[in-house]
């Protein structure tokens, strides 16, 4: 049986209210841990084209199913509620290529 390909959560974020955003940062890690997420990159990035976001984040999950479950989880819904109004964000999930 083959393992499903990894999945990647890609977030582009500009924080507009740093104090309120701390509420998100305090509880979001619990959701990511629960679903086995691994942070591959985060912080400022050099924008070559497109919108210039303050922060970029790339998180790896063992599968698309795990990434979706994390996003839909009660833990992450609570974190998203803390994030609302504290930042502008685009979040996408993308499936990895698997063995190439």
What are these regions (language model features)?
Residues 1-56, 61-72, 95-100:
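Short S/T/G/P-rich N-terminal loop/turn motif that feeds into the first structured element of a domain
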Residues 68, 76-92:
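C-terminal structural segments of small proteins and small subunits
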